[in-house]
Amino acid sequence: MTTFHSLTVAKVEPETREAVTITFAVPQTLQTAYAFRPGQHLTLKAKLAGEELRRCYSICRRAVPGEISVAVKAIEGGRFSRYARDEIKAGMTLEVMIPQGNFGYQPQPARSGHYLAIAAGSGITPMLAIVETTLQAEPDSAFTVIYGNRSSQSMMFRQQLADLKDTYPTRLQLLSIFSQETLDSALLHGRIDGEKLHALSRSLLNFSQFDEAFICGPAAMMDDAETALVALGMPQNAIHLERFNTPGSTVRHASSVQADGQTVTLRQDGRDRAIVLSADDESILDAALRQGADLPYACKGGVCATCKCKVLRGEVSMATNYSLEPDELAAGYVLSCQSLPLTADVIVDFDAKGMA
């Protein structure tokens, strides 16, 4: 379901020279709609130079009644991120979709777990909400955070992490690794990669002891970290990844599929609508938007899963998937931004969000 609401910006706080935290006020009538699992994201919508842009940003703080916060780091060529950093101010209103996303962890107060977070740069944003919420909700659990940055000056949430360490001195272990800052310990200098994790395992950490691991950052770091954790004894199904970007600069679509003239039925908000694909349509989502459908989407790159739907009839080809879990694929879920029909009379259901 595509559900945007106009939310007022309560405050904008600088985190580094390039990053800000934007906190939205959530009225009492919408607090249930904006309840979230730590690790999820919000999709923000704005018109810039006459063009509607949508971008996903991770929720970066634990749940607090009446507000919800995301962090935005301005990137080179990032129209929306630079707009967010430079122009969004307290008192403005923005269109904000209700929380989405598969990534994250829902704490269980009776659980006693040892969790690992590996983040680089802005990859810390979903981790902060997960770590803060888990340590508060699970009094017998502990968290180890490995956080990579160029330097301490580029480190997002430096003070918040220090405060968490002060609050949970025996339950939070924070390892900061800097690539461009000289440190006393060579172990904490460099980049987070497979070699670094293996070095940490030899002298500091037993990775096989962790019950769950959460990874977010550049694609190469994430892939290296995942491979290393499996080699160091962590089960594959205990490792959870959140990708902000696709590994390549060019989004791949199911372009080899000949879908010109195919009909697809969209089920949304309990209603069916038929669309007809043309040769120019790169995906079901592309065709639907061209024909005026108001479907949920954000990245269009197979990363955020905002456009997830379930195939009820027929078969589709999905070119790229960086977000759906194996059980979702087995249940028939696809990303509409990456899918084209293979058979006639395909039906896809955008109301089927039960596995999110």
Question: Which residues make up each language-model segment?
Answer:
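C-terminal accessory/binding modules appended to enzymatic or scaffolding proteins
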Residues: 260-296
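A short, sequence-level motif marking secondary-structure junctions
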Residues: 38-40, 60-63, 278-284, 323-324, ...
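Iron-sulfur (Fe-S) cluster-binding modules
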Residues: 1-2, 8, 14, 18, ...
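Iron-sulfur (Fe-S) cluster-binding segments and ferredoxin-like electron-carrier domains
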Residues: 289-291, 296, 306-355
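FNR/FR-type flavoprotein reductase catalytic core
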Residues: 83-257, 263-265
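Ferredoxin-reductase
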Residues: 2-93, 97, 110-113, 149-151, ...
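Short acidic, glycine-rich loop/turn motifs
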Residues: 26, 46-48, 266-270, 311, ...
